[in-house]
Amino acid sequence: MADLDSPQKLSGVPRPPDGVGGGSCSEISTELIRSLTDLQELEAVYERLCGEEKVVERELDALLEQQNTIESKMVTLHRMGPNLQLIEGDAKQLAGMITFTCNLAENVSSKVRQLDLAKNRLYQAIQRADDILDLKFCMDGVQTALRNEDYEQAAAHIHRYLCLDKSVIELSRQGKEGSMIDANLKLLQEAEQRLKAIVTEKFAVATKEGDLPQVERFFKIFPLLGLHEEGLSKFSEYLCKQVASKAEENLLLVLGTDMSDRRAAVIFADTLTLLFEGIARIVETHQPIVETYYGPGRLYTLIKYLQVECDRQVEKVVDKFIKQRDYRQQFRHVQSNLMRNSTSEKIEPRELDPILTEVTLMNARSELYLRFLRKRISSDFEVGDSMASEEVKQEHQKCLDKLLNNCLLSCTMQELIGLYITMEEYFMRETVNKAVALDTYEKGQLTSSMVDDVFYIVKKCIGRALSSSSIDCLCAMINLATTELESDFRDVLCHKLRMGFPATTLQDIQRGVTSAVSIMHSSLQQGKFDTKGIESTDEAKLSFLVTLNNVEVCSENISTLKKTLESDCTKLFSQGIGGEQAQAKFDSCLSDLAAVSGKFRDLLQEGLTELNSTAIKPQVQPWINTFLSVSHNIEEEEFSDYEANDPWVQQFILNLEQQMAEFKAGLSPVIYDSLTSLMTSLVAVELEKVVLKSTFNRLGGLQFDKELRSLIAYLTTVTTWTIRDKFARLSQMATILNLERVTEILDYWGANSGPLTWRLTPAEVRQVLALRIDFRSEDIKRLRL
């Protein structure tokens, strides 16, 4: 029996999905139907055919539904027919025109190419003819100019000949007139050699006679003959002789200068200045000539030759300076003195002062001169390198750096500055030590003399290094000054503070009549009253206070010095001195200097803490302890009496005022304010201790609140620091002691506290509540805090 489920056996193709027609033919062939004999198979085929019929009917219905749309589109297409025929005709006509234009353009462009080729050949022919004529003209012109000794004109003809295209001349030699051209070339070459010899000879004569107009005349001819390097070399040689002659003349004047002369102390710096100004004047005068006749980029060559001569003359001047000023011997002497345990006789710092000033002036003049050269050469290179590659520009920059950084002038100045730094260190250290040793105090002044003297010396040394225009030198001196202030000078002040603020006999007298009588009785037994001890103690107290002022002024002076250096060096960097690396080095040195200011502030704080501990605390504690002797378990009558005759706080305020008056007169406002802040902190801490040892009733708590308010009001007037924060705990204790009943604390605690931040812990609150004798301990314990 046939397999009806197999499409291959029924039709040989897969069955399509429902709704998709298979065309006008059934998938089941007639032969298949005829071959079927089984009823079930026939019924299956019948059902299949019925299904296909339904699909075909649906497709026909769908097509019939589209009939109107299709017919309307067909009508539209019929209407478009004539237009499409017109478009077809226009397109064919346009294609014909494009083809014609293309052919025409091709013909025209080929003719243009032919014309362009002919034009180029014509130009070449004209150029060749012009070159031949130029060659003849140059030959005739150079002969005439040489006969008339018109060397400029002769050089112009030779220059024109040298600029001719050699390939064109070579082609001309191969033509019919080759022999004539060869003859002309030979004559021109002979004239060229002859003119070179004449110009060289005439230039030598002019330089020998010192005839500057003639020297410049023939100097301008060299580049026309292609002798750029030779011209610059010979002209530089002439200029170097002028520089050497003037420098030797100036050096002779130096050696003959009387030491009483106004400029005798800086005569060598003046000599270098004259040398540098002379070379700068030469560069300014002849730069236009070099740029005009030799072209941009050639000034470097001229300056390179001049710098060699400058180095020779600088070496002579510096040698004379070292010898006459005994510079190296002074350095060795200083070096020996700087060594620890040195037994050699110390050199007087004043002897070094003029030498150090002259060295920095010499270096400053050198730096200014080198900056001038760098600026001139750089601007000349920029013009010449406008179209050059980056590699060429970098190579020129390397040449410039090498010339200025490695010249003998730079090396010599670096050596002098190296010795200068050591000598300046010695000058600063010895002068600072002398200022400390000669320290004096004038009555009415807050500081002693050494602070102003020391910072005058430090500023002078750093300022002198700054005047050298060398960032390395300046940074070295800032570092040395930082070390001197941080170590040596700070140690002096630290030692004075560590001696402490003495507890004097007069203080003992103030503490009570009993101790005063005892001291006087002891003194009378010895037959005298020891006023010297009192005087020396007063001096020690004054010394301590003055030292505190000195420390504070030192910190401020260092900060001011840092700001001044920042301002001054901004000007230096804006002038092109140094670079990013130098700027970073300078900033690092200033950071170290600023750190020293912080160390002086730390030392000041240590001194204030010492003063507070030794001079204020021993006095304040007994005054506060008298609070315990005043009862705060009082009745209405006592409360009223306390209001009329205050038992404690007014006397305490008076004692504080009297004690702090001594310090107010002897300390700067800033230090006094800081000391007052420490004193208020001490009062707050000590008063809290005695309050916790006292007992109160309701009126006693109210009395304590009044006393505390009076104390806070007074302390607020004597300092700019915040007082209320320091007395916050005491104020909260006063609030607690003022409560009418224990549970009233809950109105101020927790969620009910509002903006109030409690400084007391729950345990401390209970402790303060327990100070009220009228509060039961059971009620306090029951509180939930």
Swiss-Prot record:
Keywords assigned: Acetylation, Cytoplasm, Golgi apparatus, Membrane, Phosphoprotein, Protein transport, Transport
**In terms of domain of life, where is this protein from?**
Eukaryota
- List localization entries: Cytoplasm, Cytosol; Golgi apparatus membrane
Pfam families according to UniProt:
COG4_C, COG4_m, COG4_N
The segments labelled E domain in the record are 741-785
Q: Which residues carry this modification: Phosphoserine?
A: S6
GO-annotated cellular components: cytosol; Golgi membrane; Golgi transport complex
Fill in the subunit field for this protein: Monomer. Component of the conserved oligomeric Golgi (COG) complex which is composed of eight different subunits and is required for normal Golgi morphology and localization. Mediates interaction of SCFD1 with the COG complex. Interacts with STX5.
Please give the family membership noted in the entry: Belongs to the COG4 family.
Query: What's this protein's function?
Result: Required for normal Golgi function. Plays a role in SNARE-pin assembly and Golgi-to-ER retrograde transport via its interaction with SCFD1.
Question: What is the protein's given name?
Answer: Conserved oligomeric Golgi complex subunit 4
Per the UniProt entry, what species is this protein from, by scientific name?
A: Bos taurus
Q: What is the lineage of its organism?
A: Eukaryota, Metazoa, Chordata, Craniata, Vertebrata
- Gene that this polypeptide is encoded by: COG4
